[in-house]
Amino acid sequence: MFAGECFLDLQGDEIPLNPELLSDLIAPFLQSGAEMGTLKRKMDATDDLQNPGIVKVVTDAKGYALYFSRAPVPLVRDDPSRRVVSGLHHIHLGVYIYTKETLLRFAAMKTGVLEDAEKLEQLRALENGVRVRVWETSYASLRIDAPEDVPEAEEKLRQYESLKRELNLNRAAPSR
């Protein structure tokens, strides 16, 4: 069936622009004994906490997911501004890694009520008792959630390609 022992799932609407983002997931997973893993990054003031297109994650003290949501979680009850609180709010990045056994179990699971409500497949794992380990990265990914995101994504990809060319030219230039 599958030859590998662990499997990486890259979502088509979430593009990692830096290979280090994947290293931030793969390296700790291979050393952790976790059955499923994913990434988060700290939200900052430029991130829209209220945007349902940005999935948020809340973790326990050991780094396991408590919940994923399109809602602004955790909600700071006494803050009427509903702004991002540094170190408290995290964006979930849509990349996953599974052990072979967990991926096979996950594929056989039925959609649960939480997954159906939020339209987030990782909630199926939580609803079925799979512990999802979440590691932090400083790298952002490129999200494309709606047709209106495409022009901005195209511009970011052009900037990324331009930077890559510039870095490659600088490496190729002879040193004096």
Where are each of the predicted segments found?
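Short beta-strand-to-loop acidic/aromatic patch adjacent to the donor-nucleotide binding site
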Residues: 2-15
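Conserved core of the sugar-phosphate nucleotidyltransferase
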Residues: 17-109
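Electropositive, surface-exposed helix/loop patches at the edges of structured domains
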Residues: 20, 25, 165-176
